[in-house]
């Protein structure tokens, strides 16, 4: 269990009013989701319609819709007990068991998608390998930049995996990945601050994916994709299990 100050459910520095044209539920959802994924709303922080609406400068209706979606995503959960006849919602805890399950599921799904490499025409497979190499280079550049921009690093890492999904995943696999994406992204955001800054093991695993794509064998791509996620889960689980107090960015 991670310790946070429950009184800090929203910080005025984190939320700014949305322009009138963006006051639908979608932008409200994205703003709240980003705050949770990036740890600015830490595990256990209480989220209320009234305060979120006031600080975002929107009505409570889009906030209510956004919060319902965040509950479906697993990012908001009911607090223990009731308050005033209504369930209080708090940011979901970050538990090692959940991390391992999510990463193994992501690895299994992306591994299944990667098997489709074998059915790609040779030219398409070569294009995918080039895209992966380019994405990996951008990821490494982001990882070694000074000062380190975690937003950019997160995006560049996601682009490596997205290349395989775009080229290989069918509609059903994409839909399944979207279901777990918000919670996976939340753990991914903490990966580099806790496991890094030395990401050479991750680089080697990405290199294995690229080599497997070039070979074009279904089994090798699936193994490489799964290994990257499964091993990443173990690395982050060890880091989370050994950490006390609030997570990076949670305050």
Task: Show where each model-derived region lies.
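Short linear motifs at protein or domain termini
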Residues: 1-119, 238-251
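Short helix-capping and inter-helix turn/linker motifs at the boundaries of alpha-helical repeat units
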Residues: 23, 78, 151, 155, ...
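Amphipathic alpha-helical repeat elements characteristic of tetratricopeptide repeat
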Residues: 26, 96, 107, 129, ...
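A ubiquitous short alpha-helical element
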Residues: 94-99, 117-123, 143-148, 168-169, ...
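Conserved amphipathic alpha-helical segments that form helical-bundle/coiled-coil interaction surfaces
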Residues: 123-190, 202-211, 220-234
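Hydrophobic/aromatic-rich alpha-helical bundle segments in the mid-to-C-terminal region
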Residues: 195-196, 218-222
């Amino acid at each position: 269990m991670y310790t946070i100050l429950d009184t800090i459910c929203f910080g005025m520095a984190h939320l700014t009013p949305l322009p009138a044209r963006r006051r639908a539920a979608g932008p409200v959802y994205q703003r709240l989701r980003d705050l949770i994924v990036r740890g600015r709303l830490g595990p256990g922080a209480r989220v209320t319609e009234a305060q979120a609406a006031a600080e975002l400068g929107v009505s409570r209706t889009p906030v209510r819709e956004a919060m319902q979606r965040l509950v479906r995503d697993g990012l908001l959960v009911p607090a223990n007990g009731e308050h005033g006849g209504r369930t209080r919602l708090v940011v979901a805890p970050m538990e090692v068991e959940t991390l391992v399950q999510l990463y193994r599921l992501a690895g299994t799904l992306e591994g299944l998608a990667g098997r489709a490499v074998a059915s790609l025409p040779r030219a398409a497979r070569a294009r995918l390998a080039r895209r992966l190499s380019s994405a990996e280079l951008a990821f490494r550049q982001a990882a070694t930049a000074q000062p380190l921009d975690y937003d950019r690093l997160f995006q560049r890492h996601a682009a490596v995996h997205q290349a395989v999904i775009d080229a290989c995943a069918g509609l059903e696999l994409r839909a399944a990945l979207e279901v777990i994406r918000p919670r996976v992204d939340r753990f991914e955001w903490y990966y580099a601050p806790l496991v890094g800054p030395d990401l050479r093991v991750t680089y080697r695993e990405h290199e294995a994916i690229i080599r497997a794509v070039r070979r074009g064998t279904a089994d090798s791509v699936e193994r490489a994709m799964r290994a990257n996620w499964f091993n990443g889960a173990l690395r982050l689980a060890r880091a989370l299990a050994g950490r006390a107090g609030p997570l990076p960015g949670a305050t």
